[in-house]
């Protein structure tokens, strides 16, 4: 097979001389100027990577012989901005830490700073569970922080303690702790007794219920549940025992969900934040959560 270009008839394009099953290739090389431009871009790109920051390394990048910082170097920019922010807010952050929790509300400037800083902390660390709007996720047992139904108390001191130490967090000895028995799994109650007490809970929470089962469930409730949830079902924030008489449920108030709760118990865990957040950040987010709408006034504030 010939390797030499073949001249075709007049006005027909030249081919390379190659043929594959009768198919020939036109001999149409790129223009010289295009090739020289292509070569020039290669040379320019190599020169650019030598002159300016370009090649990534393990913990940084080549800086370039011209010593210029890449535009928009986010690591340096962020570090600088954080340093400037910390410097600008040093005084008010110190004031936030030094002011007693119950007296923060009396300082409008301090409240304004705490609300804004707390909102940023909440979006970064808390919204993953409690939702961006703080309404919680009932299916997963993440509490709604917008209402006034608090498991462990809703004063600013209560909220601060909960955030700082967490709930049922084994890593922090000062974490809030409570344990609901698994009445069915541990065979503390029979299936019939569980069905009865579930109907009684629906009775005291003003939901549709079976009157016969609810009447029998009252005795079961007083024997097994009232020690934590109180005789009237209003709960005990000191133990983290929820109020069973309102329409606010951590996991749900339907028969199926209540049966699951009584049978297998619940064991929600909240991490301790005192090792991850500064005291100023914990106080700021405490003020923010307290001000979402359900915060309870502390006894000291009311005096």
Regions found by a protein language model. Name each.
Residues 2-109, 153-158, 162, 181-201, ...:
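Periplasmic c-type cytochrome electron-transfer domains
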Residues 110-136, 147, 153-155, 160-161, ...:
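Sequence/structural segment immediately N-terminal to covalent heme-attachment motifs in c-type
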Residues 94-103, 116-117, 135-139:
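A short mid-domain helix/strand-loop element embedded in enzyme catalytic domains
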């Amino acid at each position: 097979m010939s390797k030499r270009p073949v001249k075709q008839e007049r006005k027909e394009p030249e081919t390379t001389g190659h043929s594959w099953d009768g198919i020939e290739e036109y001999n149409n090389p790129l223009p010289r100027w295009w090739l020289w431009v292509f070569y020039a871009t290669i040379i320019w790109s190599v020169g650019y990577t030598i002159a300016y920051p370009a090649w990534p390394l393990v913990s940084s990048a080549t800086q370039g012989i011209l010593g210029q910082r890449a535009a928009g170097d986010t690591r340096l920019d962020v570090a600088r901005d954080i340093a400037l922010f910390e410097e600008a807010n040093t005084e008010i952050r110190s004031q936030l830490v030094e002011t007693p929790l119950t007296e923060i509300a009396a300082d409008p400037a301090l409240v304004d700073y705490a609300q804004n800083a707390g909102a940023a902390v909440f979006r970064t660390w808390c919204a993953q569970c409690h939702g961006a709007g703080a309404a919680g996720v009932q299916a997963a047992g993440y509490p709604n922080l917008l209402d006034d139904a608090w498991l462990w108390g809703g004063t600013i001191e209560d909220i601060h303690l909960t955030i700082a130490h967490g709930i049922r967090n084994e890593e922090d000895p000062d974490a809030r702790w409570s344990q609901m028995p698994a009445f069915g799994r541990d065979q503390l109650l029979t299936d019939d007794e569980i069905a009865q007490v579930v109907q009684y809970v629906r009775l005291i929470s003003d939901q549709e219920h079976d009157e016969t089962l609810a009447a029998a469930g009252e005795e079961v409730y007083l024997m097994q549940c009232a020690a934590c949830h109180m005789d009237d079902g209003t709960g005990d924030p000191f133990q983290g025992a929820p109020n069973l008489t309102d329409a606010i449920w951590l996991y749900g108030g339907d028969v199926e969900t209540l049966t699951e709760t009584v049978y297998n118990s619940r064991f929600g865990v909240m991490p301790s934040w005192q090792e991850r957040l500064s005291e100023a950040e914990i106080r700021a987010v405490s003020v923010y959560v307290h001000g979402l709408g359900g915060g309870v006034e502390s006894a000291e504030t009311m005096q």
